[in-house]
Amino acid sequence: MKDHPQRWPHRPPHLFIPNTMYMVTASTIYKQHFFKAADRLVLCCEALLEVTAAYGWELQAWAAFSNHYHFIAQSPEDASTLKPMIQRLHSQTARAVNRLDGVSGRQVWFQYWDTCLRTDQSYYARLNYVHNNAVKHRLVQAAEQYPYCSAGWFTSNADIALREQVKAATPHSTEPHDDFTPAEG
């Protein structure tokens, strides 16, 4: 970790620390359910995988819903690429959804929130949170049943010790704000 992380002038300030874990949450405008159908959720997941790879962000966990998403990723050496990466993701998915709905220029995304995860406990708690978000929203009974997130892969492929650490991680007061109500599919 650098002694003086790069900052983006924002309130609260955004920290850009190379090779650090970040959690990002984004919401659609007015929490509208633009991604309610399965094909739209697939579109959102595929775009997230594509865009994070293009910017050198290593995805650790993700979950996409009808009106929001969460992801955790490790930043590249230039962590300040977060903003243009999110702008590209939002632009690409908004254009695609607008094309599907036969409209142009409609705003789809409202904004995003990012958190720099600087402790192992925070990282494990957020992994747990992202993977279990579909359960929280009562879309599935077990996280690995939700096809639009990484929980199934994590359950099948992650080292058992890591799975146990994540499972045991307790949410804390800095848990992400999430008052979304995804549409039932």
Which residues does each PLM region occupy?
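Short catalytic/metal-binding and nucleic-acid-binding patches
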Residues: M1-G185
